[in-house]
Structure formats: C-alpha cells, structure tokens
Amino acid sequence: MALYIGIDLGTSGIKAVLIEDLSRVIAVASEPVAVSRPQIGHSEQDADLWVTTVFTCLDRLAAEAPREMAAVRGIGLSGQQHGATLLDKTGKVLRPCILWNDARSYEECLELVQRVVLEDLAGYVP
C-alpha cells in the first residue's frame, strides 16, 4: 500500500490529508491561518506562520496514524494564488506576504486594463 500526503496552503488555513494509493483517506488535519488587514484594501499573512501551521497539521496526522506516516512515499502541495513573499538571501521572511486578494494596487490595475488588453498579453486579467 502506497501512502501520500496532500498539503493545501489556502488563504483561510492549512489543510493536510494522508491518503492510501486507492484514495482512501487515512487521516485529515486543518488549522486556520489569520489574515491581517492593517489598512483598508490590504490583505496579508505571516509567512513564517505557514511553516509552523504545516508542521502542526503533520504532527496531527502522525498522532492519528503513526505507522502510516512512517511509510509515506510522496507529498503533494498546493497553495494560494499570487502571494508576494519577500525573503532575504538567507531565506528569512522580510515582511508579511501580500495576498492575492490584496486591493492596494486597484487604481494601477484599472489604468493598465484601460491601456493594454492584458488578457491578450498575459493570458490573465487582474
């Protein structure tokens, strides 16, 4: 039996699942992650908190299914969209991550949309 872990780093929280190769769920864990809104239109998260929260979820999976966790063959990851996470040269987080739903550049986006057909240029509309 092959075992795998799936981890989803979502805007509202971290979710982890331990599954058997036939998609049978062995264990599930989730933990919320707070979104900071220091000003109107801002949406940020503490990227260091993501790491500790992932480990919390993995610890819960291990507590629920220790033998299965020891036999994991792979880990799949998914994450939120477009989070701007700034790191120094050692990998240390420099500031809270600016999330995909942060609206502080709304006016600039409107100007770009009016000047350029961004969907044709980039394949994505902000």
Walk through the language-model features, giving the residues of each:
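Glycine-rich phosphate-binding/catalytic subdomain of phosphoryl-transfer
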Residues: 56-126
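Charged catalytic carboxylate motif
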Residues: 49, 53
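Short glycine-rich, Thr/Ser-proximal phosphate-binding strand/loop in the N-terminal lobe
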Residues: 4, 9-47, 92-100
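Intrinsic disorder/low-complexity segments
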Residues: 3, 48, 63-66
